């Protein structure tokens, strides 16, 4: 399991990079579950990480969200994907709600020129048909996340059996699979049992709620705990919650 941490600025990105995470996810926490950053900010962060020596050409990977765009506005989703992808991130994350438009949006995303990772918003559960359809398309990976971070973690929103089926289905299709959603240090044991390829964190590494600044001590504690569990299980963890 690899570790993903969500950041909103160059300063936070460099802190996370120096802290030893595997993925740096670019988002605006105050803008919702997948709040998007301005394109100029995304580009600045990518350039700063390259200068730091951990850019997209290195081991450290970057992702960025397009923002909470309504699923009914496919044209806007496509335009946002193009704008974010052109900033040089490794992956473009797009939220997938449990709505009737999901299949058509997934088809559209699979035709873009960018490596898109659909993020299934799991507050009302995971739609097996939507997940299976995404697995049949050319995405590099899929994620499960939550929208309402105040309602608890992903494990409060979705039962363990359903999450295990999600991980097994995505992994069985040959894609990487990740989870996020207000994950905290106390969720690490459940993450170890679930064993996704990566887990995403924001809440766990902030000095307060997820909209406050990253706390270097909390980041260090998360990495130490996740690496310890990884060493025993032969894996590592990530957060984007």
Predicted segments — roles?
Residues 3-7, 24-26, 60-68, 92-94, ...:
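Hydrophobic faces of well-ordered beta-strands that scaffold small-molecule active sites
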Residues 8-19, 69-86, 125-134, 179, ...:
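Catalytic cores of alpha/beta
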Residues 121-162, 169:
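Histidine/lysine/aspartate-rich catalytic loop segments that bind and position anionic ligands
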Residues 23-34, 86-99, 143-151, 194-219:
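Glycine-rich phosphate-binding active-site loops on the catalytic face of alpha/beta enzymes
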Residues 84-137:
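Hydrophobic, well-structured mid-protein blocks that either form specific transmembrane helices
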Residues 40-45, 102-105, 201-241:
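C-terminal helical cap(s) of enzyme catalytic domains, especially alpha/beta-barrels
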Residues 37-42, 76-81, 128-133, 156-165, ...:
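Charged helix-capping and loop-helix junction motifs
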Residues 35-104:
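Glycine/small-residue-rich loop that forms an oxyanion/phosphate-binding "nest" at active or ligand-binding sites
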